[in-house]
Amino acid sequence: MKRVYLSVRLKNYEDALSLIGARCVETPREADLLLLPGGGDVHPRFYGRALGGAADIDEARDGRELALVDEFLRAGKPVVGICRGLQLLNVYFGGTLHQHILGHAQVCGRDRLHVVHAAPGLLRTLYGARFTVNSAHHQAVGTLGEELQVLACAPDGTVEAIAHESLPVFAVQWHPERLCGAFTRSEAVDGAKLLSALLR
């Protein structure tokens, strides 16, 4: 059973992890893997920009999660990011963010759905070259971080998945934990397949 450290304990993530046979642990030392979940925006000072659209900021969380990424990677342990987690990882590797984009946030409290196009690799193996995911974000990758690769994009060019060229880092902009179990949507992919593959 894979032991996962959630940087912020959120029930829907815990439920999704339980569904695939993973277990959340209380301390980073116990964990096999770090999972950075969704949440508010990363403060732009961490990527050398002034405030210009970022909202719901928690600088203490930003600093703590950046330190956790450093801790896990130094230990050779994988790091997985979801939504904000992808954005934070891009910042960690020296990238920037678009502080506000249109067309990707929730509508009336419900995740949007849109198509993404995947490069050859894990995502294409799991879901094919073109598949539908959910969307609930208003920020996105600007300048790509050093040694990061884009694995999937939305039709408008928004980066939807990244991985590091040599380190065990993988992240998606969508929410696989909200595409499995009670949150399964017939129009979109099965999020449990991705979570299972990442935690294998």
Predicted segments with their positions:
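Conserved SAM-binding loop
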Residues: G85
